Regions:
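Protease-domain processing segments flanking chymotrypsin-fold serine proteases, especially trypsin-like
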Residues: 1-98, 362-365
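Intrinsic disorder/low-complexity signal
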Residues: 3-4, 23, 159-162, 175, ...
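C-terminal subregion of chymotrypsin/trypsin-like serine protease catalytic domains
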Residues: 9-13, 243-252, 259-268, 273-275, ...
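Residue-level detector of intrinsically disordered, flexible termini
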Residues: 1, 16, 42, 168, ...
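Serine endopeptidase catalytic core focused on the charge-relay Asp
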Residues: 60-64, 71-97, 102-105, 109-276, ...
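Sequence-level detector for tyrosine residue identity
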Residues: 11-13, 22, 57, 107, ...
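Polar/charged alpha-helical tracts
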Residues: 20, 34, 38, 42-45, ...
Length: 366
């Protein structure tokens, strides 16, 4: 590399002698030159300085380098992923799917709104248990092809542990306990302030997969949401760009739309490619510890493609604290390894009642 001074700045370029020795490097240099030429031309159209282009590529490259993951973490996530489940239901024309994971023994955790979709609208909660048992089933082996009939577990007519505000529900598996995957509750850990997280679930009724995401820190949530809205609301609003449904339009969101997420200490926010069907997915930190359950997000359509302003999951610490507070007998009996050490868990949580788009998949009846 050689350097050249100009207007108080230093620019680096490859010496021709070095490029002559490495033909592949010469090709890559040409690609980079072309890339920056296009970027400079676009910056000129937008009235931006060339320095803004350099800043942009520095930031993008920095983000990519920080997404690297140790192999030992990949191996750990591979083991933990065995406990992630695919839950599907068919209830009198009401079909859908979502994600869940084994909490401990025969109990699985998923979102309260998922269970709400299983039972359908207008059903009293006292009748939910029976409908869940008749309509839904769970498998942990959907990793490639759609599982065979002998790979599924039924759900017991049991619905006793749930919370609408933290959007969680505990369901009970039926069958041979020796065939259930290991529970994840003992790996629960407080939310990370920043860094990487990994979601393992079944987006879009697909086989089990993982998505690495960057945490949006609490102090950046408001800015990230507002910048996202301002950037994409500049375009014209029409059916082609925003979709035919009002709720899918970026222009429907305002600065007040995200207050309950922005100011909620019990959620972790991030940007993920997991959309429909991923509610109930376990969320792990960079060390493979269970920090949250993926819940929902604010989505919109742009140019016929689905995008998200922000996605979030509720803290496992908050979920366990709510179970301990409201269902203490069950907590102490079913989670004996935790209740003696859980005194430091926060027992209170903020109300969370804003409307949001749930990440579940509902089939369209024709």
């Amino acid at each position: 590399m050689a350097s050249e001074e100009g207007q108080g700045k230093t620019y680096h370029y490859f010496k021709r002698a070095i490029l002559a020795l490495y033909s592949d490097l010469k090709k890559q240099s040409a690609v980079i030159d072309e890339l920056f030429a296009k970027a400079f031309a676009e910056a000129l159209k937008q009235g931006k300085l060339n320095s803004a282009v350099f800043k942009l590529y520095r930031e993008n490259f920095g983000k990519e380098t920080k997404n690297s993951t140790l192999i030992k973490v990949h191996k750990r996530l591979g083991v933990l992923s065995d406990s992630g489940g695919f839950i599907e239901w068919a209830n009198n024309g009401n079909d859908g799917s979502a994600t869940c994971f084994v909490l401990r023994d025969k109990y699985v955790l998923t979102c309260h709104h998922v269970v709400g979709h299983i039972v359908g609208e207008g059903v009293e909660e006292k009748d939910w248990a029976l409908i869940i048992s008749h309509s839904a089933r769970v498998t942990f082996s959907y990793e490639d092809k759609y599982p065979k009939e002998n790979s599924w577990f039924s759900l017991a007519p049991w619905f006793e542990i749930s919370d609408k505000h933290l959007d969680f529900a505990v369901l009970k598996l039926e069958g041979d306990r020796s065939l259930f995957p290991a529970g994840l509750v003992q790996f629960s850990y407080p939310l990370p302030f920043n860094g990487l997280i990994y979601i393992i679930g079944h987006p879009d009724v697909q086989a089990k997969s993982a998505d690495g995401c960057t945490v949006v820190p609490v102090f950046k949530r408001k800015r990230e949401c507002h910048c996202h809205i301002q950037r994409d609301q500049k375009g014209v609003c029409n059916n082609v760009k925003c979709g035919p449904e009002d709720r899918q339009c970026i222009h429907m969101f305002t600065q007040r739309s995200f207050q309950h997420v922005i100011n909620n200490p019990n959620v972790v926010t991030y940007d993920t490619s997991f959309f429909f069907g991923s509610s109930g997915s376990p969320v792990f930190n960079a060390d493979g510890q269970l920090v949250a359950m993926h819940t929902a997000g604010y989505k919109y359509k742009k140019n016929k493609q689905l995008h998200s302003i922000v996605e979030f999951g509720f803290s496992m610490v908050a979920i366990l604290a709510a179970i301990k507070k409201n269902y203490k007998a069950w907590y102490e009996f079913e989670l004996p390894s935790l209740w003696e050490d859980a005194g430091s868990c926060p027992g209170e949580h903020e109300d969370f009642t804003s409307a949001y788009t749930n990440d579940i998949e509902m089939e369209t009846l024709e």
